[in-house]
Curated annotation (Swiss-Prot):
InterPro entries from the UniProt entry: SurE, SurE-like_Pase/nucleotidase, SurE-like_sf
Gene3D superfamilies reported in the protein's UniProt record: Survival protein SurE-like phosphatase/nucleotidase
Coiled coil: none
Catalytic activity: a ribonucleoside 5'-phosphate + H2O = a ribonucleoside + phosphate; a ribonucleoside 3'-phosphate + H2O = a ribonucleoside + phosphate; [phosphate](n) + H2O = [phosphate](n-1) + phosphate + H(+)
Cofactor note: Binds 1 divalent metal cation per subunit.
Positions bound to a divalent metal cation: 9, 39, 92
Cited function: Nucleotidase with a broad substrate specificity as it can dephosphorylate various ribo- and deoxyribonucleoside 5'-monophosphates and ribonucleoside 3'-monophosphates with highest affinity to 3'-AMP. Also hydrolyzes polyphosphate (exopolyphosphatase activity) with the preference for short-chain-length substrates (P20-25). Might be involved in the regulation of dNTP and NTP pools, and in the turnover of 3'-mononucleotides produced by numerous intracellular RNases (T1, T2, and F) during the degradation of various RNAs.
Superkingdom of the organism of origin: Bacteria
GO MF assignments: 3'-nucleotidase activity; 5'-nucleotidase activity; exopolyphosphatase activity; metal ion binding; nucleotide binding
Protein name: 5'/3'-nucleotidase SurE
UniProt KW keywords: Cytoplasm, Hydrolase, Metal-binding, Nucleotide-binding
HAMAP family, A to Z: SurE (MF_00060)
Length: 253
């Protein structure tokens, strides 16, 4: 198995290095990751400037000022030859649950892999300690995929509780929960008296009930949420069409 491995928090982050070491026990792994933390980059792609890369002695590649999406795009289309069989993103330091997936660079890297036609996993640890647990879970899933491919055409968003492996209760297939809207902005002043603004923390849990990714992780399970790129709200199409007809939009300007 040939794996393109990326992340959002940089080529030297403990999560990606722990996972790369574990994956190399049974797979051909090419790391292509940002040279620095690009948290919250989501699906941004660098289009107005060129990108430089640096290759380390062990073969890992850092993309200077690159986003996670840049890294996967370059990895698939230029830097990994032959091309990968699968794209893996992580291990993220902190969870990507509920609405987090909208902003997540970790999920975005996996999404770019899927957009380019490859199976893709996004892996996050709900903490900063037991990266080995998340790595073991990921390796188990990838070994299973080697034996029997999963042909859903979906991204698997994997969240692992920050526990020793023997304390993980199992795996649950989940849906995304939701958070309350974030509303905190933290103002500060620079030495010249100018006001600076920091984006505050995410909103608290809103829908974290049974079946959600929040609930699974809180209860000590691995959460696997299938995600897809198509954002169409199919169930709303007829509602919108009927509304347009009723108000006359499209027939009178």
């Amino acid at each position: 198995m040939r794996i393109l491995l990326s992340n959002y928090d940089g080529v030297h982050a403990p999560g990606i290095q722990t996972l790369a070491k574990a994956l190399r026990e049974f797979a051909d792994v090419q790391v292509v990751a940002p040279d620095r933390n690009r948290s919250g980059a989501s699906n941004s792609l660098t289009l107005e400037s060129s990108l430089r890369t640096f290759t380390f002695e062990n073969g890992d590649i850092a993309v200077q000022m690159g986003t996670p999406t840049d890294c996967v795009y370059l990895g698939v289309n230029a830097l990994m030859r032959p091309r990968p069989d699968i794209v893996v993103s992580g291990i993220n330091a902190g969870p990507n649950l509920g609405d987090d997936v909208i902003y997540s660079g970790t999920v975005a890297a996996a999404m770019e892999g899927r957009h380019l036609g490859f199976p893709a996993l996004a892996v996050s640890l709900d903490g900063h300690k037991h990266y080995d647990t998340a790595a073991a879970v990921t390796c188990s899933i990838l070994r299973a995929l080697c034996k029997e491919p999963l042909r859903t055409g979906r991204i698997l968003n994997i969240n692992v509780q920050d526990l020793p492996l023997d304390q993980i209760k199992g795996i649950r297939v989940t849906r995304c929960g939701t958070r309350h809207p974030a509303d905190q902005v933290i103002p500060q002043q620079d030495p010249r008296g100018n006001t600076l603004y920091w984006i505050g923390p995410p909103g608290g849990k809103c829908d974290a009930g049974p079946g959600t990714d929040f609930a699974a992780v809180d209860e000590g399970y691995v959460s696997i949420t299938p995600l897809h790129v198509d954002l169409t709200a199919h169930s709303a199409q007829d509602v919108v069409s009927d509304w347009l007809n009723s108000v006359g939009v499209g027939t009178q300007w």
